Amino acid sequence: MNVNGYKIESGADLQKANLKHAYLKGAELSGANLSGANLVLANLFEADLSNSNLTTAILDHADLSEADLSEADLSGANLHNSYLRHTHMIFCNLTGAVLDHADLSHADLTGANLTNAVMTGANMTGVELTGATMPDGSLHE
């Protein structure tokens, strides 16, 4: 699915949508409801997903590099092997999210909540974690 050139209304309801392999590069999805959506292998490079609801969304192998996920809710989301390089995830809720083998290199997770997140094998090179709540519940200073 290629939605390049289409306008997606702010706060769109895409709950449980099948967007597998979707080309959403640079998409404006701020405030969208994508809870439970299938975004496996989706291209969300530079997409604006700030304040969006991505609870329990499936984002395996998705490219979210340089996307804005500030204040987004990704609790319980599956981001296995996803690309989150240079992604803005400020105050993002990642409670219980699966981030195993995800590439988070140089992402900004300032104030993010990672409580109970699974991060086995995740690339954390250069990640900003000031004020973030870590998987074990401790606060990163």
Regions found by a protein language model. Give the residues of each.
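Tandem repeat scaffolds
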Residues: 1-141
